[in-house]
Amino acid sequence: MTSNRSTAWPAPAKLNLFLHVNGRRADGYHELQTLFQFIDYCDYLDFAVNDSGSLTLHSEMEAVVANSDNLILKAAKSLQEYTGTHQGAEIWLDKKLPMGGGIGGGSSDAATTLVALNHLWQTQLSQDELAKIGLSLGADVPVFINGLAAFAEGVGEKLIPVEAPENWYLILTPDVHVSTAEVFNDPLLPRDTPKLSMDDLMSSDWHNDCQPRVAERYPQVAKALAWLIEYAPSRMTGTGACVFGIFDTRQQAEHVFAKLPAGLCGFIAKGTNKSPLALRLTQH
């Protein structure tokens, strides 16, 4: 069964280098402006294609997330239905990214599943078609499929590739799961940050409108930010809970990481404007 196993398909994390909430639409979704950048810290997926059409997932997450709710299986099923293929796959997930951390782990896993199976099943969908399927699974999935650092606005689906500084990051992972829906439903969330042009945004001070509310509701996030900001410019990514400090070199990040107090966990990663998934695809 595993002789045709295609291995080590990366599902990278992302950071929101800024996240501005510009308003709320009539349908309840929020108008955002944000900048996505990938980091070289990833989940990894293996795939073994079959002709039976069956889809199975092996993961230490099985006890945490029901298969019916798993975005990996939803992505594979969506690709089957969209293309009409009779092929299936056995999938293995090596989970390294924290869930509910604001670094896109579930969305990235779904994107890697779509990109890898489109290649392995030879269903030959375009990137735009894959992104359309991805958007039905989650607002962040298309950026992982496109594979380039991007400025996004709307609900996050309008993407413009950008070249952001590829800094080193120390990312702290508070042991708390932040609900995105809960954050965006918070009546005290700022929703009136003025919309700016991309040029203005790229030259202005960056912030995350969700950060003050999350820090107030989750002391673990506030603690991580308070410690990290003593050493480097620091912000929360997405709706949290992860926070990141920005460094020019790996050595600087490692120097601060070595001082990490008990009770805080994290990792060091490099920002990259081209997704490791896009690079993996070119190796075939």
Swiss-Prot record:
Gene Ontology molecular function, alphabetical: 4-(cytidine 5'-diphospho)-2-C-methyl-D-erythritol kinase activity; ATP binding
Keyword terms of this UniProt record: ATP-binding, Isoprene biosynthesis, Kinase, Nucleotide-binding, Transferase
Pathway assigned to this chain's UniProt record: Isoprenoid biosynthesis; isopentenyl diphosphate biosynthesis via DXP pathway; isopentenyl diphosphate from 1-deoxy-D-xylulose 5-phosphate: step 3/6
Active site: K14, D140
Binding-site residues for ATP, renumbered to this chain: P98, M99, G100, G101, G102, I103, G104, G105, G106, S107, S108
Record has Signal as a keyword: no
EC number: 2.7.1.148
Family: Belongs to the GHMP kinase family. IspE subfamily.
Name under which the protein is recorded: 4-diphosphocytidyl-2-C-methyl-D-erythritol kinase
Species this chain originates from: Shewanella loihica (strain ATCC BAA-1088 / PV-4)
Lineage: Bacteria, Pseudomonadati, Pseudomonadota, Gammaproteobacteria, Alteromonadales
